[in-house]
Amino acid sequence: MTRVADLIFARLADAGLSHAFVVTGGGAMFLNDALRREPRFRWTCHHHEQAAAMAAEGYARVAGRPAVVSVTSGPGGINALNGVWGAWTDSIPMIVVSGQVKRETCMSSYPGLHVRQLGDQEADIISLVRGITKYAASITDPRKAERHVEEAVRLATHGRKGPVSYTHLTLPTNREV
């Protein structure tokens, strides 16, 4: 059985994407592994998520096609926002894939619970990026993963170009397998 994380990078490669700018982390461990396994991708590790997002923006400007930013949950996704904002304002295509804590420890699973954070290193990144991306979704149903990836690539590369965050595609850790 194909893991959702493997499917994501396989479909991105099928769409012609070949470069990823990465900061690894526990909240994206299966995404990190899937990227390593996909032979059509070249990836560069960075020390900070902002640098990874800005490197992806620079790559897209030079290559004329989007790159992938892959970061971990919570602060990882938040740290990438300066680069996502830059891509948004300059209409630069970018696909951001971030990890997320287990669905059971996401605030979105408990709408009546009035706390700011539930899971360790959790952030509601989708709400944060919705205004600066063309598409933002959390893959909570593995059967819909392929559709999310296709939509993210389509929106990032057609019409007025811009970042998508699954594009932020977030993938809860327990949905990555």
Residue ranges and their predicted role:
Residues 1-169:
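N-terminal alpha/beta PP-like core and its mobile active-site loop of ThDP/TPP-dependent enzymes
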Residues 168-177:
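Single conserved hydrophobic/aromatic residue that forms the stacking wall/gate
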